[in-house]
Amino acid sequence: MKDCSEKFLVIGAGPVGLATAKAFNDAEIAYDQVDADTDIGGNWKHGVYRSAHIISSKHTTEYADFPMPEDYPDFPSRQQMLAYLNSYADAFYLRENIEFSTKVVMITPRANEFYEVEFASGEKRVYKGVAVGSGHHWQKRFPDYEGEFAGEYFHSKDYKSPEQLADKRVLVIGGGNSACDIASEAARVGKSCHLSLRRGYWFLPKTLFGKPTAESFMRYFPVAIQRFFIKAALRVVLGKYEDYGLPKPDHKIFQKHPTLNSELLHYLKHGRIKPRPDVKKFEGKTVHFVDGASDIFDAVVCGTGFYVSFPFLPEGVVKVKNGNLAMVYAGCVLEKHKNLYILGTTQPRYGFGPLVTPSSQMLAQIIKLQDEMELPIGLVMKHSGVKLPDSHLVDPIFALRQMKIAKYTLPLLLRKEKKLRKKHAEKVNSKENVMFQPNSDMQVY
């Protein structure tokens, strides 16, 4: 077994993994970096379709310390995003430290607070800590319906090109960004396209008044004010969703991730996409809907999202709520495990750019502080009143402000940690001839 106990392991070479590696270099934190794929890019390398473009904008997606090229359009393509991520890695000399085609299959916390990491090759190494930046766009979430569909049935992650839809009767299930992109492509190349929605969504155009919607000046205002003005703008620009045959949204805007797509409503009005309610059951190639209607399809595409899960970690190490919300403090910190960090499981309302660099810098600061503590810093955060997340959707402006404050407040956790240790030491000393057994709240790994 290879001894890497003075290093961290960074898992993933996508946007988050690369930013983490740069932050570790800047903070002089020794690390190795691995990725299961053959090159840089993460989800942009293996998980998106050939015609994909970002839905936010280049200025809300670019790294804070590495702007995108000036000649990039407002909504760069998959190929441009890959080129950008590669240029970021090369500019900061990150590539030379990445081991590609190296898949992690198990991470085991050891009693001495190190981590045993096993790879698909069978190799094992011991690390001081692990930063998991492998993303959450890989365990597909499929809907559960009665019966089986006899035609082509696949997840949006397995969609790569319009040829998969050409001259076919296509049903797309879901109203998120990928589902609506695929429905729009099916409207262009398919024989027909239907879109099944279980609930109402907020559909926003990618631009408002000539500017990317994600770059609206309104993002600096409180959410209540943003909601008021965006709803007013949508009423002027789009009208009512019911006029397109769509159900009304069943939630306030930004309570769930809005869908940014400028083509969906266009194709609905042109009759190239037909809105449908939720599916009731499959019967051969016939799909029955909850309103009693039915139709025959050649292909069903499920744009129904992903589960957040960590199969390479022992069960219970990371608690996940509702299948999509990792219970971590400060966006990455576990309560009971020192130096095991879970990155990138939240979803900004728009591009990752404003958050990924400062959050990686904050992680480096947290690691430095953990070195000065005996207790897990997550446990100290818990006793300091830091809250667990209640939604996977993050307001980037609010989160950025919080990280700026955290730069100065995090060191105060050292004092809190000393008080916690003293408190429990007093409990030990108060019990003569009885060995202190830590309660479940104080067990560390």
Report each predicted region and the residues it spans.
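Short loop/edge segments at beta-strand edges and connector loops
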Residues: 100-102, 155, 197, 275-277, ...
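Rossmann-like dinucleotide-binding core of oxidoreductases
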Residues: 2-40, 123-125, 130-259, 266, ...
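Glycine-rich beta-alpha-beta "Rossmann" dinucleotide-binding loop(s) and their flanking helix/strand
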Residues: 130, 134-158, 188, 290-326
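C-terminal, flexible cofactor-proximal segment of oxidoreductases
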Residues: 205, 326-330, 339-445
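N-terminal glycine-rich dinucleotide-binding loop that anchors FAD/FMN and/or NAD(P) in oxidoreductases
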Residues: 47-70, 213-229
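Feature captures the FAD/FMN-dependent oxidoreductase FAD-binding
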Residues: 74-138, 267-271, 281-286
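C-terminal catalytic lobe of FAD-dependent flavoproteins
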Residues: 247-318, 389-445
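Helix-loop-beta segment of a Rossmann-like dinucleotide-binding subdomain
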Residues: 62-78, 116, 166-167, 244-255
